[in-house]
């Protein structure tokens, strides 16, 4: 009996030891918390944590509380993924840090103001990086939309916005990119709200440079941020964009010091998009030295009396000092359906410099002013205009 009890004790000791070792192994090999651990902030549970970097957001019950809780989750620069699994309200902008992914699915995020913004601290493309937004219906609480910017991203690189629907007033911007390098916008819908003023020229997708007048919000942060830095390597694919203007790469209309070669945008690609303008051009690429527009439907509904604003697809150098003419800088307009007023497709330089190489081919272009104005390519060192159908 004594031997038997001794053996039992030995077995219990071995079992206990193995249990401790196994527990330690699991503790070290996985995480220091159980799956779906609760993440708390200000004494409230705000998320279930599925791994060190994945959070399933739990609504707090108030718009301000949701915004504070989400900003707590997204504001660091560590890699993290936040899943929004409910329709929620926020009172103002979310401010993500670097290396942030927000998965919103088909859920609606309604804000008392805008929805996404970053505040750069230096005039560098690397100041803010690695933001991905997947899905979501992003809107303002007003039925007429925000008369401002819903998503403003500046001095940033490696930005991706996919399958998002963004509502904004005609006089605002659904997405505004200021001095960005390396942005992909894919599968998104930018939808205007409210009434479109007859002379409105605001675009739902704005590709901008950083100057005091084009980016007053940045200027208020620091005048040093507004040095004329342009945007480059911007890709817009499989999107539907409608607005007073649809998509525009902007230039500083009243700031001649920022209309120089170093302030020109470059490498803008727009493919497989449906773009509509109601009171200005559907698609306007100003002061852009290299661009590709392919497989798009571009429609301007602007009255002819609006003159240049009634052009369907415009690519233009505005007055100032443009880049040296080089055939390395290409503008390619291919396989699009373009409907305009004064012109369908219009490529023109208002400076002493010409475009480098311009290719306009396999398009179907229409101008309400007459067939001869369907396609006009002026001021190009080398141009190929071929296999187009005009009306």
What are these regions (language model features)?
Residues 81, 92-110, 120-137:
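Beta-solenoid repeat scaffold
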Residues 53-83, 89:
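Acidic Gly/Asp/Thr-rich repetitive segments characteristic of extracellular carbohydrate-active
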Residues 357-391:
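Leucine-rich solenoid repeat scaffolds
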Residues 14-26:
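Bacterial N-terminal signal peptides
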Residues 24-39:
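Sec-dependent signal peptide cleavage junction
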Residues 67-71, 90-92, 111-124, 143-153, ...:
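Extracellular beta-strand/beta-solenoid scaffold signature
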Residues 4-16:
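Bacterial N-terminal signal peptides that target proteins for export
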């Amino acid at each position: 009996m004594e031997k038997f009890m001794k053996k039992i004790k030995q077995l219990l000791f071995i079992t206990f030891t193995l249990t401790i070792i196994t527990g330690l192994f699991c503790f070290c090999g996985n995480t220091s918390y159980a799956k779906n651990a609760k993440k708390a902030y200000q004494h409230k549970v705000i998320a279930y944590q599925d791994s060190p970097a994945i959070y399933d957001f739990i609504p707090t019950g108030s718009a301000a509380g949701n915004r504070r809780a989400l900003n707590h989750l997204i504001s660091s620069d560590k890699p993290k993924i936040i899943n929004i699994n409910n329709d929620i309200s926020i009172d103002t902008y979310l401010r993500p840090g670097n290396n942030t992914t927000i998965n919103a699915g088909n859920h609606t995020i309604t804000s008392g103001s805008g929805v996404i913004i970053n505040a750069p601290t230096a005039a560098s493309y690397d100041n803010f990086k690695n933001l991905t937004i997947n899905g979501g219906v992003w809107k303002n609480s007003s039925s007429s939309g925000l008369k401002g910017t819903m998503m403003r991203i500046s001095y940033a690189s490696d930005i991706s916005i996919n399958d998002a629907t963004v509502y904004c007033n005609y006089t605002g911007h659904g997405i505004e990119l200021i001095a960005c390098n390396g942005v992909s916008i894919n599968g998104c819908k930018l939808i205007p709200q409210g009434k479109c003023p007859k002379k409105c020229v605001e675009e739902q997708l704005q590709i901008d440079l950083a100057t005091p007048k084009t980016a007053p919000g940045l200027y208020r942060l620091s005048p040093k941020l507004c040095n004329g830095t342009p945007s480059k390597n911007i890709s817009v694919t499989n999107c539907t964009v409608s607005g007073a203007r649809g998509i525009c790469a902007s230039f500083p209309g009243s700031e001649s010091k920022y209309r120089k070669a170093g302030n020109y945008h470059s490498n803008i690609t727009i493919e497989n998009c449906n773009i509509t303008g109601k009171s200005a051009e559907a698609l306007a690429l100003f002061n852009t030295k290299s661009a590709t527009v392919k497989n798009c439907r571009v429609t301007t509904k602007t009255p002819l009396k609006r003159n240049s604003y009634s052009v369907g697809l415009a690519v233009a150098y505005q007055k100032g000092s443009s880049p040296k003419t080089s055939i390395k800088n290409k503008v390619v307009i291919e396989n699009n359906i373009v409907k305009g007023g004064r012109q369908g497709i219009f490529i023109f330089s208002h400076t002493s410099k010409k475009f480098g190489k311009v290719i306009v081919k396999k398009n179907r272009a229409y101008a309400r002013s007459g067939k001869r104005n369907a396609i006009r390519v002026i001021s190009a060192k080398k141009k190929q205009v071929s296999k187009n159908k005009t009306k």
